[in-house]
Each structure stands twice: as structure tokens, then as C-alpha cells.
């Protein structure tokens, strides 16, 4: 990777600005999953070991009005981070001004400060999300060097990543470095055979990824709601299954281009209702009843996909195989997750989002080589797009 990493910087006595991804799920003011905070620890701890002063900031949710601020403060994150680090994390409840500047000036080597949600700046003209140059310059003025460890927002050009990096020497944190290595590796130089498994509801969300991976992968296995648009493109009856009618022609084109590289399900678990209480059964993919909808892949498809995965050296998975949140239609996702987890000599990567949640829920997280922390960023990377948050980091 030709970008500077945090280990390339001299951090002793330095004020180190760190863009982390602390966009954690919250309920009633409490953090329900702290994975993203845990993922940032190696970078923060390294800065402290090097006697730097860690000045952390992140967004949390979307903030458009004063009312939106309710429940979007990073204060609970500071408390949790303090517990994880085993040391005080000074929280500053503002994003600019004398209080923040004074707190940073008083910071000693090896100390940590977290300031308020960067998107509080969006209330007045979307300064953070639109990468307001003055805001980027101001935040850059608060530190000596900048470390970007927020891969989750790398596909966005915001003041808190690109804006600061255009004004200050910058480097990738350890998490960002890992994401670039694994997700970038799939696109740029994978060990072969490379098998991609793509799920999720909509073809429209994954068109770019499918198109790019058809040029890179040896096989692309497709599951989830988007399979029915491909089936319709082949002239199959799909009953009441999810269909993006305006994408059928596009799906047809992808099928023609892909040949036998694209593998579709051979059966489906169907039901008359989108409900866990309704009766369900498995049918062949080409005989879905007119009054039923496909909500998961069946056992024959799980077996087929498991077979296609054998011998793979690199596997990337993004998106569930069915309606994972309803237990009757989660078996396909579980089956695929198990099949990937059982591969012994492959680099296995989950591209964030629902698939990452599925692997963690099932207790398989440690069986994968890498689970990405950025859903949208991973997808854009897999599409072959340049990510502004990565591109703006200083070159070595």
C-alpha cells in the first residue's frame, strides 16, 4: 500500500488528530454494540505508547436539526472507550471554539480526548458532510498530524476526513490499513480461485459490484432478493417474489456477459406471507407458485454454493441469502456462513453490513480472515471506485 501508515509518523509530543468510526448503534442512550470502538483500540493504544496526544472525533448517525442532536452525543462512547482503555477519556461536548481549543492545549502526552459528533456541524449548511473547506482547515489547525482510521466513511468526502487531510500530513490507522489490504486485495491482486458471494434485496444496490467482480472473480454466486430479477430475466416464473422490473434487461445483459461464471439458486424457500408465522416450503427455482414469494435459498442451493466454494483461495461475501431477520428464512445465510467459515486455506472476507452481523450473531466472527467495518465503503471499493477517504491520505 503506497499510503502512509500511523507507524510512518513521529508521534512523540505531537497532537494527533484521529478520525475514528464510532458510529455505534444506540438505544435509550446506551451502546448496544461496541465493535467499532473495539476496532479502533490498536491505533489509539499505539499513539499513546508513542507518547502522542490522541484527539479523537467521529460522526454518530445523521444530524440535520437541533432536535436530531438528542441521543446523538458521543458522551456514552467516551465512557465506554474509557472502560476499554482503562484510562480517562476527556470528553468535550462541542465541535469547535475556545472550550475545545483549551482542552487540546492542556492535553499531556499519553492522554486521550474525544470531542462531540462531527455531524453537529451539519445543522448549519451541512459543513461536515459537504466538506466545507473552512471547517476542514479549522480542525486541521487543532493538531500536528492526522490519522484516518474510519474506513466506514472512506467513500465520503467529508470535512473530518478529506478536509483535514488536505491541510495536514496524514496517515492510515491500523484498521484502515487492514481494510485496504484485504478489500483492496480482492480487487487488485487476489489469490485464485476468487469466489464472490453476493446477496441482499436489490440488484440496483449491487450492479456495480456484480459488473466489476464478473471481471475479477472466477465465480460469482448470487442469493437474496435480487436473484428473482435474474430469474425473471431468464423467463422464469417468480410468483410474488421481489422484482425490480426496470432492471430485468440489465440482469439479462449481465447473464449473457457472465456465462457460467454467475451461479444462481436452484431452489427457494417460499411462503404466501412475509412473516415468520406463515407456513413455508421449498420448491425448485423454476416452479415458484404464482401466489407465493421466495424468501430464502433452499438446501439444494446451500449444497451447490458449498460445492462452488471448495478449493477457493479467496472468498468475499456481501449480503444475506434470504430474509435473515426472520428465523424461518435465515437458514440459507447460516448455511453459506458455515460453508465459508469451514474453508481452511482460503482468505475469507465479509464486506460489512448484514453479512458481518450474521457472522457475529452466529459466533463465526473468528473463523473469517477479515470482517469489514464499512458496508457502503466496502461495496464501493469492490466496485473498483476510488475512495476519497483513502485517496486523501498522504503518499509514502
From Swiss-Prot:
PROSITE patterns: PGLYCERATE_KINASE. It comes from the Bacteria. It catalyses: (2R)-3-phosphoglycerate + ATP = (2R)-3-phospho-glyceroyl phosphate + ADP. It is found in: Cytoplasm. Substrate binds at residues 21-23, 36, 59-62, 119, 156. The keyword Hydrolase does not apply. GO terms for molecular function: ADP binding; ATP binding; phosphoglycerate kinase activity. Keywords: ATP-binding, Cytoplasm, Glycolysis, Kinase, Nucleotide-binding, Transferase. ATP binds at residues 206, 294, 325, 352-355. Pathway: Carbohydrate degradation; glycolysis; pyruvate from D-glyceraldehyde 3-phosphate: step 2/5. Pfam families: PGK (PF00162). One of its GO terms (biological process) is glycolytic process. Belongs to the phosphoglycerate kinase family. This is Phosphoglycerate kinase. It comes from Listeria monocytogenes serovar 1/2a (strain ATCC BAA-679 / EGD-e). The gene is pgk.
Amino acid at each position: 500500500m503506497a499510503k502512509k501508515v500511523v507507524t510512518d509518523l513521529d508521534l512523540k509530543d505531537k497532537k494527533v488528530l484521529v478520525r475514528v468510526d464510532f458510529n455505534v448503534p444506540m438505544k435509550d442512550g446506551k451502546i448496544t454494540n461496541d465493535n467499532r470502538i473495539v476496532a479502533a483500540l490498536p491505533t489509539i493504544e499505539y499513539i499513546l505508547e508513542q507518547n502522542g496526544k490522541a484527539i479523537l472525533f467521529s460522526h454518530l448517525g445523521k444530524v440535520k436539526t437541533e432536535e436530531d442532536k438528542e441521543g446523538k452525543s458521543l458522551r456514552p462512547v467516551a465512557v465506554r472507550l474509557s472502560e476499554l482503555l482503562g484510562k480517562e477519556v476527556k470528553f468535550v461536548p462541542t465541535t469547535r471554539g475556545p472550550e475545545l481549543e483549551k482542552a487540546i492545549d492542556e492535553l499531556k502526552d499519553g492522554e486521550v480526548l474525544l470531542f462531540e459528533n462531527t455531524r453537529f456541524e451539519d445543522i448549519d449548511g451541512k459543513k461536515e458532510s459537504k466538506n466545507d473547506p473552512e471547517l476542514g482547515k479549522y480542525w486541521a489547525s487543532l493538531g500536528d498530524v492526522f490519522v484516518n482510521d474510519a474506513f466506514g466513511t472512506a467513500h465520503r468526502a467529508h470535512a473530518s476526513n478529506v478536509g483535514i487531510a488536505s491541510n495536514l500530513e496524514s496517515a492510515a490507522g491500523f484498521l484502515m490499513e487492514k481494510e485496504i489490504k484485504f478489500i483492496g486485495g480482492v480487487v487488485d491482486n487476489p489469490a485464485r480461485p476468487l469466489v464472490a458471494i453476493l446477496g441482499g434485496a436489490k440488484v440496483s444496490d449491487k450492479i456495480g459490484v456484480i459488473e466489476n467482480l464478473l471481471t475479477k472473480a472466477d465465480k460469482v454466486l448470487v442469493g437474496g432478493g435480487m436473484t428473482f430479477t435474474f430469474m425473471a430475466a431468464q423467463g422464469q416464473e417468480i410468483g410474488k417474489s421481489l422484482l425490480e422490473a426496470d432492471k430485468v434487461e440489465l440482469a439479462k445483459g449481465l447473464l449473457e456477459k457472465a456465462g457460467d461464471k454467475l451461479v444462481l439458486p436452484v431452489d427457494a424457500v417460499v411462503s404466501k406471507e412475509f412473516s415468520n408465522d406463515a407456513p413455508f416450503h421449498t420448491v425448485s427455482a423454476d416452479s415458484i407458485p404464482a401466489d407465493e414469494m421466495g424468501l430464502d435459498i433452499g438446501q439444494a442451493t446451500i449444497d451447490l454454493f458449498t460445492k462452488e466454494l471448495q478449493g477457493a483461495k479467496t472468498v468475499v461475501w456481501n449480503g444475506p441469502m434470504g430474509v435473515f431477520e426472520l428465523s424461518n428464512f435465515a437458514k440459507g445465510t447460516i448455511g453459506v456462513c458455515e460453508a465459508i467459515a469451514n474453508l481452511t486455506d482460503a482468505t475469507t472476507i465479509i464486506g460489512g453490513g448484514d453479512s458481518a452481523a450474521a457472522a457475529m450473531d452466529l459466533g463465526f466472527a473468528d473463523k473469517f480472515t477479515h470482517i469489514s467495518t464499512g458496508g457502503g465503503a466496502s461495496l464501493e471499493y469492490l466496485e473498483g471506485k476510488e475512495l476519497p477517504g483513502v485517496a486523501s491520505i498522504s503518499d509514502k
